[in-house]
Amino acid sequence: MFERNRYTIDQIDPEVFAAIQQENQRQEDHIELIASENYTSPAVMAAQGSQLTNKYAEGYPGKRYYGGCEYVDVVEQLAIDRVKQLFGAEAANVQPNSGSQANQGVFFAMLKPGDTIMGMSLAEGGHLTHGMALNMSGKWFNVVSYGLNAQEDIDYDALEALAQEKKPKLIIAGASAFALRIDFERIAKVAKAVGAYFMVDMAHYAGLIAAGVYPNPVPHADFVTTTTHKSLRGPRGGVILMKAEHEKAINSAIFPGIQGGPLMHVIAGKAVAFKEAQSPTFKAYQEQVVKNARAMAETLMARGLRIVSGRTESHVMLVDLRAKSITGKEAEKVLGDAHITVNKNAIPNDPEKPFVTSGIRLGSPAMTTRGFKEGEAVKVAHLIADVLDNPHDEANIAAVRAKVAELTKQFPVYA
């Protein structure tokens, strides 16, 4: 028997408890600008920390390989119904443990080793699961990549020509470092013309799409994959949305194809997050995410920094640091010293190595969750520019850190 007041983390494992407390304090004290990170609600965290973690539930609602699944069936069906409604999908699988596994589920269901796939080049903003040589997708399939034009938008004409030439089995849209709107309808027409399946990885944009502030790929794609964290602000996990005709193949690919028992406590967190995402406050939040990103980008450009593509139309932006004679790796470090958390990121045709880079990627979802609006976004952009103007001046770093502390104290994550 477990007595709740005796089996607490601080009593059982002080080392882990201390690390959790320190991470909690870091999240409160630092301004989080990593585009793929966000803060979940206490309700989502409570679902993830529930007794559902104890339950094995191989299979799907109403068709399990274990007994005692009547209540986890309720939870999973709620998650399925809510995410379908949220995005207007015909069918959904909420069991993938990550966005990468959601992508793998589509590959496993619809492709054979050696098939040709088309995805956005990682070097120009794509994701490693879309065909990077070291990733499973790059090892199992023949990969052809599309990229950007001179204006640093997707080169749709070149994409179409490449698809006509290579006749891929699957075309993938979606990115991890691309700030503009993606024309999903146009790519869908290309896929149809060459007889390819069309998959969209909307992991970065899912929250914006749910709120209607970014184009929805669901009406145009055979498959739409996503993570459930990032802009969607749920637990770490994945989802596959699909046309009804593909539901059986996808479900079989996830279980028993690439996964065993689903993580029911995480699926509960997904269900809660999907309900939160249906609220008017979530729509207002996503509208503010876009406003804050735009305010940051405009301020950084006014301070002499180049934004890749010249603007942002979403939550994310890439900052070209070459004019400041500082690498992405160095910028990540000095901004971190100032309690501003970013990640180094390659820019298109980056001359630096992947672990060095010439840029940083910034995103507005987490700071917007804190309650930041345009005024704070402008302040944050100025603080970033202040650090990058004098990256080795300790007094400058300390001054910025003090201003960050004022903002984070005014806008706590968890009040």
UniProtKB/Swiss-Prot annotation:
Cell compartments where the protein resides: Cytoplasm
Q: What does this protein do?
A: Catalyzes the reversible interconversion of serine and glycine with tetrahydrofolate (THF) serving as the one-carbon carrier. This reaction serves as the major source of one-carbon groups required for the biosynthesis of purines, thymidylate, methionine, and other important biomolecules. Also exhibits THF-independent aldolase activity toward beta-hydroxyamino acids, producing glycine and aldehydes, via a retro-aldol mechanism.
Q: Which cofactor does it need?
A: pyridoxal 5'-phosphate
Which residues are involved in binding (6S)-5,6,7,8-tetrahydrofolate? 122, 126-128
**Name by which UniProt lists this protein:** Serine hydroxymethyltransferase 1
N6-(pyridoxal phosphate)lysine occurs at 230
**Pathways involved:** One-carbon metabolism; tetrahydrofolate interconversion; Amino-acid biosynthesis; glycine biosynthesis; glycine from L-serine: step 1/1
Q: Tell me its EC number(s), please.
A: 2.1.2.1
Q: An example Gene Ontology cellular component term from the record?
A: cytosol
Q: Quote the SUPFAM superfamilies the UniProt record gives.
A: PLP-dependent transferases
Q: Which UniProt keywords apply?
A: Amino-acid biosynthesis, Cytoplasm, One-carbon metabolism, Pyridoxal phosphate, Transferase
Task: Give the UniProt family note.
Answer: Belongs to the SHMT family.
> NCBIfam families from the xrefs?
PRK00011.1
Q: Which GO terms describe its biological process?
A: glycine biosynthetic process from serine; tetrahydrofolate interconversion
User: What is any Pfam family matched here?
Assistant: SHMT
A single MF term (Gene Ontology): glycine hydroxymethyltransferase activity
Q: Where is this site: Plays an important role in substrate specificity?
A: 229
Q: Which residues form a coiled coil?
A: none
Q: Which organism is it from?
A: Ralstonia nicotianae (strain ATCC BAA-1114 / GMI1000)
Q: Tell me the subunit arrangement.
A: Homodimer.
Q: Which PROSITE patterns match?
A: SHMT
Highest taxon in the source lineage: Bacteria
